[in-house]
């Protein structure tokens, strides 16, 4: 147990970190193009925030949260998602006093007690954006375009964008009645989760993963028939903007997402080659959430992207670029006589911005040269006893195998020029 990571968690090893940094860099760069600024929130919050924000009838709250009581008898929860945390920060720090919209993005670990499988972990990472303070469908379209642009920039093709309107408190009661009327005769044959949701939140019956219940849901009354004029106009406006932007989409009237705070727009981006875990991004509008947690009535929309799933997708298609993990200089010091000199020269080169390694183990010249090759060093600086006695060092260009003697006092200036010309 001591040498095994907890089930559902995974080490990100040095050989994998470069891919994560590439993914994060792409996300940050595109967020900057759209004017979104990074926010960093605590990894745990008061449990009440998620109960009220996400909804007590959701799977996340009922089954998946990591909740604990601290020494002050406070109930705290590791964040299962970050929208609730972002809007809590928005209220606490009075960001609503700033000119709208407030445009935020985040990258970080989330925690859910879920069944681990490919692309799904108990500690997982999400990238997400939130836009607060704008009611119209134009910001919905921008959010969706941002998500699509990130995935396309990473090289993913054949993405499937699904959109829907889940209505608002004015039009959902009618849809709720129609759903209960439709599902009531079949309730006995549905799964236990659906039976418990029937009275509390029948909209969630459309989100069930049970194959039998999915077949039933396919014939359920569409929310489109129940939308109020405001929601209809909003949804038509969104579709018009997506069409104008040249973004393909399909309307899926059973798309409701798994969190209770969504209103009006809901969307999901799928990447079919991932199979059962094909959803790489999902989000929607949450116009009542900020008011629900104690802030002023403020419209909002956002999405979250599962970073493990996105990495799985781009790795499966060999879309990761080649990363240059080479070093500039390896300092070879046969024997221990000149170790202090080697250490001093390595430090001087690093202070000039070069990536430098040298041998700590007093290995043979041959072993040190092998290590330089393994590290893909561009140059090797050899501080042999005979050369040092003459006030010189040997500089070897590893790509051409050319060797030259250089004065010790000129090592830094010569290598600085050589490394810059090599780039």
How would you describe each model-predicted region?
Residues 1-423:
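TRNA-recognition modules of translation machinery and tRNA-sensing kinases, especially anticodon-binding
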């Amino acid at each position: 147990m001591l040498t095994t990571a907890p089930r559902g968690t995974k080490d990100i090893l040095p050989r994998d970190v470069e891919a994560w940094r590439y993914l994060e860099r792409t996300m940050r760069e595109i967020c900057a193009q759209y004017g979104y600024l990074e926010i960093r929130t605590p990894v745990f919050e008061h449990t009440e925030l998620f109960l009220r924000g996400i909804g007590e009838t959701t799977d996340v709250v009922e089954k998946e949260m990591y909740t604990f009581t601290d020494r002050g008898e406070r109930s705290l929860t590791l964040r299962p998602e970050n929208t609730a945390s972002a809007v809590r920060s928005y209220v606490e720090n009075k960001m609503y006093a700033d000119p709208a919209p407030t445009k935020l993005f985040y990258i970080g670990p989330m925690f859910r007690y879920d069944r681990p499988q490919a692309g799904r972990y108990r500690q997982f990472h999400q990238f997400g954006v939130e836009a607060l303070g704008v009611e119209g469908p134009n910001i919905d379209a921008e959010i969706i375009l941002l998500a699509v642009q990130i995935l396309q920039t990473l090289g993913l093709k054949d993405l499937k964008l699904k959109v829907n309107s889940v209505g608002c408190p004015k039009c959902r009661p009618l849809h709720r009645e129609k759903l209960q009327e439709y599902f009531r005769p079949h309730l006995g044959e549905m799964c236990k989760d659906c039976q418990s949701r029937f009275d509390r939140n029948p909209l969630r019956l459309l989100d069930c993963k049970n194959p039998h219940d999915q077949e039933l849901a396919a014939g359920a009354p569409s929310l489109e028939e129940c939308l109020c004029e405001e929601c209809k106009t909003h949804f038509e406006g969104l579709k018009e903007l997506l069409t104008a932007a040249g973004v393909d989409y399909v309307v899926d009237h059973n798309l409701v997402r798994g969190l209770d705070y969504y209103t009006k727009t809901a969307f999901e981006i799928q990447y079919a080659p991932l199979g059962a875990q094909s959803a790489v991004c999902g989000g929607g509008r949450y116009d009542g959430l900020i008011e629900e947690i104690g802030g002023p009535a403020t419209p909002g929309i956002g999405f979250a992207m599962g970073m493990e799933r996105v990495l799985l997708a781009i790795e499966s298609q060999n879309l990761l670029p080649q990363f240059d993990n080479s070093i500039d200089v390896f300092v070879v010091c046969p024997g221990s006589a000149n170790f202090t000199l080697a250490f001093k020269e390595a430090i001087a080169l690093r202070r000039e911005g070069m990536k430098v390694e040298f041998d700590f183990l007093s290995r043979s010249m041959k072993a040190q040269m092998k290590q330089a090759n393994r590290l893909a060093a561009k140059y090797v600086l050899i501080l042999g006893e005979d050369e040092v006695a003459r006030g010189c060092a040997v500089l070897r260009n590893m790509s051409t195998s050319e060797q030259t003697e250089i004065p010790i006092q000129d090592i830094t200036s010569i290598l600085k020029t050589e490394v810059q010309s090599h780039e």
